[in-house]
UniProtKB/Swiss-Prot annotation:
It is a single-pass membrane protein. Keywords: Membrane, Transmembrane, Transmembrane helix. Its main location: membrane. It comes from Escherichia coli (strain K12). GO terms for cellular component: membrane. It is found in: Membrane. The chain crosses the membrane at residues 12-32. This is Putative uncharacterized protein YbbD.
Length: 86
């Protein structure tokens, strides 16, 4: 009975060690991963956006022309556009 208990405890320790290693690998990957195709641009106001920048093609017609502190994040490959302004 003692041999079975010893083997069971070794198996449980081994499984926990594997789980810890997998969790650490996932956390490391998520911490170190950087999306290289994500482009971020920041403008102090709407008038600071250059007309030939291409950002205007992403902005809707009703975008406020008085907007300030504009941050734009785009990823053309994933068809992603995110815009922040107060």
């Amino acid at each position: 009975m003692l041999a079975i208990s010893s083997n069971l405890s070794k198996m449980i320790i081994f499984i926990f060690a594997i789980i810890i290693i997998v969790v650490l690998c996932v956390i490391t990957y998520l911490y170190l991963y950087k999306d290289e195709s994500l482009v971020s641009k920041h403008y102090i106001n709407y008038m600071a956006i250059p007309e030939n920048d291409g950002v205007f093609t992403w902005l809707p017609d009703f975008f406020p022309h008085v907007a300030v502190d504009i941050s734009i994040y785009t990823n053309v490959e994933d068809d992603y556009f995110f815009l922040i302004f107060p």
